[in-house]
Amino acid sequence: MGRKWVASVAVGASAWLGLALGFGCASNAPKPLYDRLGGEQMIQVVVEDFVGRASGDPRVNFTRKGTPQQWDPTPDNVEKLEKHLVEFLDAAAGGSQEYRGRDMKSVHAGMQITNTEFDAIEADMESSLSKFDVPAQERSEVMAIIEGTRKDIVELK
């Protein structure tokens, strides 16, 4: 009887210790990028600044003037674009939103975006992230998400 009791205590103590250590490890796990960015509100603020910045950047050709996919930046169109960008970044950063837009390749087809224009877009996003004091690690992760879309967006080298 004594040995069974000692064995039971040892097993129970081991289980509690394992749980305690497991919970300790879980709390040290890095938060998703979404949380580290400040959630949807911060993503929304950065996206709004980015759209304003990129639309005024002549290196970007934001309206795609002179291409088969020229875009009219009406208030409704800008609102839709911002909504899709927020959804995309939210989902890519581990947030709860689902991106409901079309895939990057089909939505940018015919826009004739060049690598130089894409580089300018990245610079504008980097500036918007910096404006709101997004830390370097998180900026780097967002920029990796953006860079990951290059192959689907750039049509003209």
Predicted regions and their residues:
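Bacterial N-terminal signal peptides that target proteins for export
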Residues: M1-W16
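C-terminal motif of bacterial Sec signal peptides marking the signal peptidase cleavage site
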Residues: A20-G24
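Core of compact, soluble alpha-helical bundle domains
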Residues: C25-K157
